[in-house]
Amino acid sequence: MRALVQRVKKGGVTIPLENYKENISNGIVLLLGVKEGDTIEDVYFVANKCCNLRIFNDENNKMNLSIKDVNGEMLIISQFTLYGNAQKGNRPGFSESAKPELADNLYEEFIKRVKENIGSENIKAGIFGATMEVEIINDGPVTIIVESKA
């Protein structure tokens, strides 16, 4: 499992065909990729790591606070292309990405785990498998990759 974590001033997701829109401010936009073979243990590891990453500045302007410490918001977006491989040719392959059934289940479990960790009122999410318009206004920028397996 792979999470691309971005500290943001604001973020949003719009799904025009679903008439769906969510927005956050001062927090994290997290793009989540699920790999073939991932399990609930991967969900727990990555979710806990992302909820406790100290990527927000303290009073000394040092990255020393977590999203929980700053009462930040998180926008979670499923992104199978995080496992895109472009080593051969010019068109990426996605054979490492989990099949939709597994990925959807683990994506929903990830959201559930983050809500338990941070509080559901601060968590927003995209819709698995939907074509989305994602708005990200980075803060820093600060971008961290969290993986459950090397």
Give residue spans per PLM region:
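N-terminal, polar/charged subdomain of small-to-medium soluble alpha/beta proteins
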Residues: 1-93, 101, 105-150
